[in-house]
Amino acid sequence: MFKICALSLLFFGLPMQYKMVKTKVNESITLMLPEEFYPMTPEDIARRYPSVRSPLGAYTIPSLMADFSVNISATRWRASDIDMAKNFFRAGVYNLFDKVTMIREEVQTVNGKQFIVFEFDSRINGDPSSLEARQPVRRYNYVQYLLINGKTIVFSFNCHARIKEQWQQAVAEIMTSIKVKNNI
């Protein structure tokens, strides 16, 4: 019994160590991702990120339980409006989900650039009248917004809530490795 508990803790309760590899999203954006992440196919992107704008980059893992994406938002902000933009994006987070438990909300400097950071757990309630979506969907999310040259670049990680502890440390490494050239 002890061995089963120990193995369960090892596989489900402790953060995993990932080999990080440099990833070039485009000519202006590089970051480190765990090596098991691979670019999503156009079909995966269309299914998981339905939008008029395709992401600059979208990556997933073989189990499809964790995703990382880089997008340019339609909202345009000046870097000097970072506090107002933070409140705007915060409201958007709370409107997007049925329940949000904010873990971290701040402006953080990463490689000389100021990012708006939201780390949170989310829940979308299930529909009791639906045969497909009865159970709530719980996810761990880490989102960073960069206001640069009149653009808003969004770096977003999410995974199933039950594997949150496995990914939190790696996500922090991903987000602090982001490098964006000024010419974007």
What are these regions (language model features)?
Residues 30-87, 91-95:
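Secretory pathway targeting signatures of secreted, lumenal, and periplasmic proteins
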Residues 86-144:
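Signature of long, low-cysteine stretches enriched in small and polar/charged residues
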Residues 77, 122-125, 159-163:
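Solvent-exposed loop/turn segments at secondary-structure junctions
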Residues 35-39, 150-184:
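Surface-exposed amphipathic alpha-helical segments
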Residues 1-7:
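Sec-dependent signal peptide recognition
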Residues 144-150:
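A short, solvent-exposed beta-edge/loop patch
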Residues 17-34:
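Short N-terminal segments immediately surrounding and downstream of signal-peptide cleavage
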Residues 24-25, 45-51, 107-114:
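Short, ordered beta-strand-loop transition motifs
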